[in-house]
Every structure is written in C-alpha cells, then in structure tokens.
Amino acid sequence: MQHGAAHLHYCLPRLLTLWLDFTENIEDFVKKKGKSMTLAATIENASKVIDRFLSSHWRSLIPDYFFLTALPQLVSRLCHPHAKSFTILSSILTSLLSGPHSQQTFWHMVAVSKNRNQVRSSRCLKMFEEAKKVSKQMRKTLEDSITFASMIDDLCDKVKTEKGTKSISLQEHMRSLPALVNRSDGIILPNQRNLLVTLPTGNTDLQQHQPFPSGLVYIQSIDDEVAVMTSLVQPKKITFLGSDGRRYSFLAKPKDDLRRDSRLMDYSCLLNKLFKKDFKSRSRNLHIRTYCVIPTNETSGLIEWANNLKAIRPIIYQLHKDEGRYINVKWTKQYESPEGASLEVKRKNLLQCLEDLRGPVFSNWFTNNFTDPQSWFIARYIIITIIIIISISIIRMAFVRSTAVMSMMGYIIGLGDRHLENINVDTTTGDTFHVDMNCLFNKGETLAVPEVVPFRLTNNMVDAFGPVGVEGPFR
C-alpha cells in the first residue's frame, strides 16, 4: 500500500481484520487458564508491537483517503474492547472527520451516532466533538450536517400525509429545512460522485493525488415541492440544487433499515472493481448498477434517485393493455389458489393464467421504444433499418448481461422478493436496476409461500433475451 493502490481493496480490509480480530480476543486468551505463560506473554508483546507500529506510522505510511475505502469496516468496530486498539481506531476516524474528507466520513457515521447501543453512539458523538475543536469552520460544517441529518429523519418519520397525497410543500410542513440549506454552504450531496473514492493509478504521488477529481458538489438550495410516493410507507422525493447548477433528487425513506442496502451497495461496488480487472468481463461491460444509500438512523435514510428508470410490471401491463387484455388486481385474483390447495390445483390455475395471457410480450417493449419510424425516408430505408436493428441489439444485450450479473449476485447472497416492481429497466441503456434488497440470505425460503427459485427467469424475462433465450449471452 505504500507503493500504490493496485491491491488496496485486498490488503487494507485484511490488515484491519487481522489487527482488530487479534486484539479483540487477546485479553480473554491471556487470562484463560491452562495457557503457557510464555505463549501468553509472546501474544501480549505481539499486540503491543502492532499497536505501537500503527499508532506511530499509519499517517506516514498511507494517505488518509485510503481509509475512506474501508470506512464501513472501521465504523463497525467502534465497540472494540481493547483499549489501545480502540485509541488507534479512534485517532484514524477523528483524523478523517477533521481533515479534508470530513463530509464523506460524516455520512458514513451519522447513523451510528443515533444507534441504540449506548457505547457505540457515545463513542461516535465523542469523535464528532473532537473534530469540532479543529476550527470554527469545521464546527459549523459538522453542526449543520448533524442538524440536516436530523431534519431528514423528521421529514421521514414526523411529516405525515393523507393517503393519496401526491406532493407537499416544505414551507408548510418543515420550513426549517430550506432555511438551514440556504444559510449553510458546507454540506455536500451524499451521492456516489461525492462519496466514491477514485484511487491513483501508475506512478502517481499518493500524497498529492486528488481522490475526488471531478470536484465536490455542495447543496445550494432545496425545492419547496416534495413528491410523495404511493407505496405503503410513503417515502418522499426531495430535490436539491447543487453548486454545479444541476438538480439532484433523493428518496427520503422511513420505516426501513437501510444499513443492509448500504452494505449491499458496497458489495456491488467491489464486484464492479473485480469485473473491471478481468479482461473477459470488461470486454462484455459486465457491471452492476449502483446508487448511494445513506442511513441517517436505524429506521430511515436517504437513497440516491436514479433517473430514466421504469419498473417492468407497468411495462408488461401496458403491453397487454395494447393488445386488449386488461390486467389488474381483480383479474389476477381469479387465478389465485385457495390456502391449502393441492399442487395439481395450483398448477391448473397457473396454466390457465398463462393461457389467457397468450404468451410473453416483454420483447415488444424493446422494439417499440428503440425505433423512430417517423425519421424513416424511403431512400434511406435499408440504412435506417440496419441502424435500428443494431440499436435494439445493443440495448437488448445490455439487458441480458445485466440480468445475468444480477442473477448470479442474487443467487450468491440469497436475494429474494424479485417481483417486477423491484426490477427496473433503464429506458436509455436497457440495463436492469434492482431496488428494495431487504430479502437477503435466503429469507425468501422462510415466507408463508416459500420462494423456491434462485432468481427471476419467467417467460417474459426470457422473451426479452431475444430468439436464443437463455442459451445466448445470458448463459
């Protein structure tokens, strides 16, 4: 790590794990009866050597921004029982909080400051206080950020709306939020651009490298109108004006533990790095679409809004409607099997449903949405047709490959609840985009109606793969 970042994602997590795991259990091991005094003394001395080395050398060995890549791992160890190791851990986090990457560190720690575990939250708050002592500007920035996060919590949990409400005004429901945003100039947008570190390549000077080369985007103002989503918990879509003049939207979601989603995004980002390292996956542009998830407490938080997305279910419903078949809750109810029905009855109802649907229709969406017949001219008919075929093929290929990647990843982590409202498609690139990933580690197998398939591969999904189905790029 002293000589470059090529192996940072392998080395740093392992170094931290070995160090913190070793010192976490050392006192119990030393005190355990039946152990050789010589062995116990050797282990204790080894711990002291490690702690002494880290406490005096970590700043000079690697730059601070390297630790931004391992922030979730560092923050998860705030309850570390070994006093000396925690002192070093605390110094690393406090240094990040009070340095040039203060805001990035804050967004990773804000939820921990409100944790129900008193030791964890008190230690986090103490680090905040230590960072505030650096300068008046640092104090103001951190205090504004803490207040901003608390207001987001209030917007999620305390601002109630009537069923059917499509939007609310912040001036009517939470005037203090736009007032804070207008008077503060140091709160960065919690999106991937601001939080995802760009590591140096080649012979770049590690200390001089800029980990955020595009520059940071700060919150300038917030739109008064807040859209209210129609789902059960009624999350709210808020839009900020960034310091670069662009608008950025986020979903303020209540009554949901977003810490799992946040860790899953970290996992997805790591997989993307592995895909880029491998020639075959890189040439196929294999990747997972990611977005920023910031828990602001244990039950709510902010989710970066992704544009140009459309859930697959309404797409398929509209395609059936265009062919004269109207699918709604009442229509699907007639095919539901009663509780305790035999497998034969369930099979019969399913086959009847599929027969009435008259086959899959999802492939029609690609043909309908990635052509422009009005631009056709008779003299250019052949050329335009070829261009359209190529365009559809590229979009379809992106859909197939992104579906394959998400199917593999979902199988590995036991991802369930993959109904067509949770699978979106990008209307500009064709990529699949999965949301609401709370059903993890094969939890779907424990539901009242167990999920017995590893990923979604229904007839409509296969239909969108093209003539070769699963035997082509998907496999």
Locate the predicted segments by residue.
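Hydrophobic two-helix hairpin corresponding to the core of helix-turn-helix DNA-binding domains
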Residues: 47, 71, 85-86, 93-96, ...
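Catalytic-loop signature of eukaryotic-like protein kinases
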Residues: 417, 421-424
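Intrinsic disorder
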Residues: 6, 44, 61, 65-68, ...
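Conserved ATP-binding subdomain of kinase catalytic cores across diverse folds
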Residues: 198-398, 402-415, 428-433, 438-443
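C-terminal catalytic region of ATP-dependent kinase domains
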Residues: 22-26, 33-39, 51-120, 126, ...
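Eukaryotic alpha-helical scaffold "rod" segments
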Residues: 2-62, 185-206, 342-360
